Amino acid sequence: MVFFSDNIEIYNKRKLVPFGEYTPWYDYLFELAEALNIPLSNLSHGSDDQKDIYFKDIKIIPVICFESTFSNLVNSDNTRELMINISNDSWFGNTLAPHQHLQISQIRAIEFNRFILRATNTGISAVINNNGKVIKYIPNNTEGTITGKIPIIESRSIYSQYGDIGILMLLFFTLITIVISGFYKKHE
């Protein structure tokens, strides 16, 4: 992903698609990978320690394709102001996958209280507001351009501040409740 501002800014994809962009345990599965003849199946991922990306004064959350499925990756720095998701959805063909990929971006918009600009080569390109609503879009397999103004939102969502802590606490208290209720049933 390259942004042009005063300087050229580069972001390298950190989460690669298994068996699509890299082969897990490649050293052990080399023969299988070669037999399957999957193009681009041995790419290298970008570093987790990449410099921030800016467009003018706006701090960008760059997300490439499959990375949008990882909340923790997107939330690695909750000071970012705008999420940009680019994707090659041509892999999916005429399936429901481009719609599901868009829905994942809608969830991220809600989770992080951020607008998302989503640009795809064949999938659904869209502007998604911080409530997960698609404001403008270009349908699947359609060429086009989206223009508009995107507000920068300063406030953070609870999820962007605390991540999975709430879910983990709920799980913990549920387990404690199950253990305690099992203990009392055993001693009745």
Language model feature labels by segment:
Residues 1-162:
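Soluble catalytic domains of enzymes that build or remodel membrane lipids, polysaccharides, and related
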Residues 161-186:
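Selective detector of the "anchor" transmembrane alpha-helix that sits immediately C-terminal
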